[in-house]
Swiss-Prot record:
Pfam families to which the protein is assigned, alphabetical: FabA
Reactions catalysed: a (3R)-hydroxyacyl-[ACP] = a (2E)-enoyl-[ACP] + H2O
Protein name: 3-hydroxyacyl-[acyl-carrier-protein] dehydratase FabZ
Organism whose genome encodes this protein: Rickettsia bellii (strain RML369-C)
One GO term describing the cellular component: cytoplasm
Primary enzyme class: lyase
Ranges that cross the membrane: none
Domain of life: Bacteria
Taxon lineage: Bacteria, Pseudomonadati, Pseudomonadota, Alphaproteobacteria, Rickettsiales
EC number from the UniProt entry: 4.2.1.59
List of catalytic residues: H49
Length: 145
């Protein structure tokens, strides 16, 4: 099952310039999800990171992983219209390959553990089949107030 950008925008609140998932290419609710982010030179972070050699900031790769996980949460719960997903912890992040405009980030997230409203994930970013980044993180799902 694929999810296009229109449905992604229904599932998570992020918008340009901070929406970092372009498409979901595979999802197994309550288990895992795979999506893509096409990295383009038009993105605002590249005006300063770095002008002579644009490089995707590692923190934005982690954010893309977290956004993909939030989509997985929404699909696993059936909806997050009345819920908010908050990042609680980021652990063991590693950056192994430079990601630059023209690259396609293949992002994968897996649910490692789910206890009540706290979910733990493992996630990776690959470019051209090579590991670019990996991280583990924890999120809390809360009712909207």
């Amino acid at each position: 099952m694929t999810i296009d950008i229109t449905e992604i925008m229904d599932l998570i609140p992020h918008r340009y310039p901070f929406l970092l998932v372009d498409k979901v290419v595979e999802i197994d609710p309550n288990k895992s999800i795979t999506g893509i982010k096409n990295v383009t030179v038009n993105e605002p972070q590249f005006t300063g990171h770095f002008p002579a050699r644009p490089v995707m900031p590692g923190v934005l790769m982690v954010e893309a992983m977290a956004q993909l996980a939030a989509i997985l949460v929404a699909k696993s719960l059936g909806s997050t219209k009345n819920k908010e997903v908050f990042l609680m912890a980021i652990e063991n992040s590693k950056f192994r390959k430079v990601v630059q405009p023209g690259d396609t980030m293949h992002i994968h997230a897996t649910i490692d553990q789910q206890r009540a409203n706290v979910w733990k994930f493992s996630s990776t970013v690959k470019v051209d089949g090579e590991m670019a980044a990996e991280s583990k993180f924890t999120a809390m799902i809360k009712d909207k107030s």
